[in-house]
Swiss-Prot record:
Its main location: membrane. Glycans are attached at residues 33, 58, 71, 90, 108, 117, 154, 159, 168, 174, 220, 225, 238, 259, 289, 301, 319. This is Lysosome-associated membrane glycoprotein 1. Residues 182-224 are annotated as: Hinge. The keyword Chloroplast does not apply. Residues 1-18 form the signal peptide. Keywords: Cell membrane, Disulfide bond, Endosome, Glycoprotein, Lysosome, Membrane, Signal, Transmembrane, Transmembrane helix. It comes from Gallus gallus. Pfam families: Lamp2-like_luminal (PF01299), Lamp2_2nd (PF21222). Lysosomal membrane glycoprotein which plays an important role in lysosome biogenesis, lysosomal pH regulation, autophagy and cholesterol homeostasis. (Microbial infection) Plays an essential role in efficient replication and spread of Marek's disease virus, by facilitating viral cell-to-cell spread. The chain crosses the membrane at residues 380-403. Residues 186-213 are annotated as: Disordered. Gene3D superfamilies: 2.40.160.110.
Amino acid sequence: MGGAARAVLLGFLQASSSFDVRDSTGKVCIIANLTVAFSVEYKSSGQKQFAHFFLPQNATSQSHSSCGEGNTSHPILALSFGAGHLISLNFSKTLDKYQVEELTFHYNLSDETLFPNATEGKVMVATQKSVIQARIGTEYRCINSKYVRMKHVNITFSNVTLEAYPTNDTFSANKTECREDMVSTTTVAPTTPKHATSQVPTTSPAPTAAPSSPAVGKYNVTGANGTCVLASMGLQLNITYVKKDEKMGLDLLNFIPHNTSASGMCESTSAFLNLAFEKTKITFHFVLNASSEKFFLQGVNVSTTLPSEAKAPTFEASNDSMSESRATVGNSYKCSAEENFQVTDKALVNVFNVQVQAFKVDGDKFGAMEECQLDENNMLIPIIVGAALAGLVLIVLIAYLIGRKRSHAGYQTI
């Protein structure tokens, strides 16, 4: 289990960048220090590829940022970098809170530096709602990694200190801590790779056929007091590596359930699920927060043997500062949508149709389900569409009845 404790903290690979937004009088409306890492899926020669890069320290905020104008618009922190890339945080506030109402990322696939040989050379847009919230008069603080998942894009915020609507031009003395910092039960010293870089080399990876979605397998870990982890999921590992010729390679591996062995360990507040397939092993570290009676996925450790073309024969990565797959003890966490766990900027663990329960499991039976936000959003869309259609039908019916009544009123009795 030593590997699970060696966390490779993504945010420590790149120093934080500082930005502020001022109105026409020079008063600050947004101030921020943060590290932002991007992982973007794109197509190259018909094959799926991944670009990994950081928000550079020379990103600029002057062109597109604004403090808003009265009640007509809200403050926005917009950071432009590279060949037409833009990440923007749109803020709003209530009486006692401010929040990032919407996160938007524009990325230009014609940028050969970040997206070599991209099939489509156009600007793409990814958005996500409400990713940050804090009390008015406090700074928002989040040292641990905060993952934001969008279509084809994963964004990781770390080492974040920001404040909107500050009283003065500096951060407030009081702070609002993010959930990721509050639930951390262990402090892990960051480890820095010997050759850390802020973006992948500009040469294109060799085309790699993307496998289909993995089959779903069911796994469990049993200790002295019974089952402590029960999991059902499809599992896929995505590794970006350097080849011997210094080009980039992509290794995509689907776990085959009947060839996958499960083991693990049960402790009072920790549970480990080890899944081994061929020469690859993934360890999931679940933690119990006794005060809130919640369990969550805190860590993922990956070790594998790379293809013979790789410069290094083996690969190992770990992140023990996550806060994923959260549910009440006795219940199970369920997510039908694909989820992507970013271990490092070179390693992604993708899970499909996952259902997992830890610490209080009745044999091989899952407890009541707590659905993920992605599934709730997917369920909400047809409800909204259905309600809109029902409203449209009602409007047409009312218009028809009014028209019919008026036509009757036009007749004269002879």
